[in-house]
Amino acid sequence: MSAAPGPAGVQVILVDPAGRVLLQLRDDDPAIPYPGTWCLPGGHLEDGELPVDCAVRELREEMGLDVPPAALHHVVSRQRSYGLEHTWWAALDVDPATIVLTEGQAVRLFSPEEIGTMTLGYEDGDVLADFLTGR
């Protein structure tokens, strides 16, 4: 018998007008997955929560960003090594310097070229490679 799948989650690819992607540096806490690693913002669905609502909530809770559901565009939902992940993208229309984090150490914009050289947490490198090349 195989193990039960992990919890479902969401992640959001936030893209600025120059085509750069906002990544979040995770806390440097050894008790969390991928400590001190750059990742896409996101989190786990709460019981009964729709994925798009989770994406809105996570961006508000972790970064103080108010992104309406209509501004989120579904990219893919796929089983990953840790559970079912729903990926969305949205245009980023704020200066990252104004983002006040409640989780993580920092946020920063990265070009597609920079992202291609990075080791990201979870399986975010694969997700971004597919997204940035239109796959």
Spell out what each predicted region is.
Residues 66-75:
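A short coil-to-beta-strand element that immediately follows conserved catalytic motifs
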